[in-house]
Amino acid sequence: MEVVIKKKRKRGRRIFIWASSIVLLLVISAAIFLNIYTLKSMPKIDGTIKLEDLQQAVTVKRDSKGVPHIKSENAHDLYFSQGYVQAQDRLFQMDLSRRQASGMLSEVVGEAAVDRDKLFRTLGLRRAAEASVGQYDGEAKYALQSFADGVNAFIREAKKEKKLPVEFTILGYEPAEWSIVDTLTIGKYMAFDLGGHWHGQAFRYWALKNLPKEQANELFPAYPKDAPRLLAELKNTNVDVAQSFSKTIIPPEFNGSNNWVVSGEKSASGKPILADDPHLSLATPSIWYQTRLEMKGLNVSGVIFAGVPGVILGHNDKIAWGVTNTGPDVQDLYIEKRNPNNENEFLYNDKWEKATVVDESIKVKGGKTIPYNVTITRHGPVISEFADKGKEKTKTVFSLKWTALEPSAELKAVLNMNKAKDWNEFETALQDFHTPTQNFVFASNDGTIAYKANGNIPVRKKGDGSLPVQGGQMNMNGKGISRLINFQK
């Protein structure tokens, strides 16, 4: 009897060893295959690449850290090459960035991203980018299109040679062509990433609705004591904040960005010292893409966001500059009263006013399409219903007015900043930089130092943006836009 038991144990042990060996062999084989496939998909960064769209020869040298130094004879080739090289290094990141900002993640990752897509479709960053294309002309539009053409040259090459980054193979899709709108949408996303005051207004509204006035004031004591009328009005409205925003994505606050500039009068070298330390969201790969761009009349080094041409912070032969977030309140929630007989009409100045309804149907991986409409009042998109799943439309909603949803041309400013030779040219370039509002520090070879908080900020009629305001009253909030100017030496 004992012999039989021992034989069974030995047989079981052998089966376990064989099974473990097979599993281990499969794991090792898969790892080897994945490694070989990944290496095969790596872009060519040595030797000569022939691209039909280039007008003249371009040199791309990568330093010991892999940073590309691009030198060309003309603007088209410079930005075309920047787009091509960025796509070599960051195409998957670029594609996910435009998809997230556009509300198109579900198409490649499935239903888990639907609520996130609804949020970004509702906000309308891509709609704002599409409206901004008309703000660009001349050299700026030429640079944007050249950059997009460079990205597309790499996409076509990678598809043809079956060398797309391995992430595309894992997710089972190929990237669509790049466009100017994609670049501008990523720019608008940065305003989202660096903003987020509306959720504070929503929380204060909830506190006033659910807590005694004294306790609510303890949570935001800066609220003016002599403004009881607004509090009373809010008490008589009803937006379910907890339900409306339970699925929202609020950018994490990594507070503490800093930049500073010191006059040469106070430095050992006699030259200005400039330092810049912007704290943005942690990401892998980094949100920043470092590069150097050189052609006649331009020699600029620094960083930019993947998917965007130029350099957002850095230096050229004459000047250096840094950027951090100013963080002003540029968002306002409006309390909109819906017509009980027509869900697409809202009260304004004692009349029912028809809202715009935009079809933002969401494609989901696997072929499914989810119908989704975005309602836009005169103030902005209705954002308090994006996560509702088939619920009856509420009588009162929040709409969002936000400077980033206006047409603007920040990348025109960036490209002109890159070429600026002194403070006057740099400040002139900033006239096109509207959102997000940023702190710019500046230093030049001639010893000039300057600081300017630059961007569009709402001028509120009552001087306070801590709470939502009634959308049905004419000019209840907003008297225009203020542009900030600060010290210069």
Model-derived regions: residue spans:
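Substrate-recognition/specificity elements adjacent to catalytic centers across diverse enzyme folds
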Residues: V3, L34-I273, P278, A306
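N-terminal type II signal-anchor transmembrane helix
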Residues: K8-L51
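Alpha/propeptide regions of enzymes that mature by internal proteolysis
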Residues: V60, E410, V414-D432
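Short helix/loop capping segments that flank catalytic or ligand/cofactor-binding pockets
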Residues: K71, Y79-F80, G270-K271, L282-P285, ...
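Sec-exported extracytoplasmic/periplasmic mature domains
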Residues: N152-K160, K419, Q431-Q438
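Short active-site loop/helix that positions an aromatic residue
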Residues: L280-L293, N424-F433
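Compact, glycine/acidic-enriched structural inserts
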Residues: N299-V300, F305-I370
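Hydrophobic alpha-helical segments
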Residues: T435-K489
